[in-house]
Amino acid sequence: MITILAGGTGSVKLVRGLASHETDVNVISNVGDNYWLYGLYICPDIDTIIYGLADLLDYEKGWGIKKDTFGFLRQMEILGEENWFRIGDRDAATHLIRTNMLKNGKNLSDITQWMCEKFAIETKVFPITDNILETRITSNGESLHLQEFWVKHRGKGPIEGIEYIGADKARPLPSAVNAIQDAELVIIAPGNPLTSIGPMINIKGISKELSKYKR
C-alpha cells in the first residue's frame, strides 16, 4: 500500500500517475486552504485531487473542472459580489452539495468518501482531519486567509508570518493515521511546503507517524 500526503495543484499529477499504476493507493489531503465563500464550503485541494482522479480536472489551469462555464460567477458580479475566486458552474454544484451535507451533520471525511463513490474513484481519499484547520498569512500587519493572500491579492506583499489556526486542537482522521501506519511507502507529494504540507504535519501526531519512515 502506498500513502500520499497531497496538496492540490502541485500534487495531483503524482497522485494520478501512481493511482493509474498501483491498485492500493491512499491520498491524505490538506484542508488548510478550505474556505467559506458565498455561504459555500470550498475545499480546493480535496476537489483538485478528486477531479484529477475522475479525469474531470482542467489540466491547463490545474484546478476546477474542464470546459466549465462561469454563469454563476457572472451573476454574482452583477449582484454586487466580489468574483476574485473563480468558481465554475459545475464546480459550484460540488460546493453546494458538500455544504448541505455538512449542515445535515455529515463529516468532511464522509462527504469526501461519498464524492469518490459518485465519481467511481477507487483510490481512497481522506482529509487529514475533520476539524477546522486554517492557514493564515500575515502581510503588512494584516492576517489573511491563504485564499485571500494567494488568489485575491495574488501573493503580493511581504509575508511576515504564517499560522495554522486550529492545528493544536485538530485531531488527525483515524483513517488517515491508519493509512500512514499500514503503508509500505509514504510519499509527500510535490507541493508548497508551507501551505500544502505544513498544515498537515503541524497536526499533533502526524510528524511522529511520519518520522517512523525516516531512513
Language-model region placement:
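Extreme N-terminal starter segment of soluble prokaryotic enzymes
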Residues: 1-3
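Short glycine/serine/threonine-rich phosphate/pyrophosphate-binding segments
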Residues: 10-15, 195-199
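Short, conserved loop/helix-junction motifs that constitute active-site signature segments
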Residues: 19-23, 207-214
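Short internal beta-strands
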Residues: 26-32, 214-215
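Electropositive, gly/pro-rich neighborhoods at or near active sites that engage anionic ligands
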Residues: 30-164
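Short gly/ser/thr-rich secondary-structure transition/capping motifs
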Residues: 166-171
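An anion/phosphate-binding loop that grips the pyrophosphate of nucleotide cofactors and donors
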Residues: 183
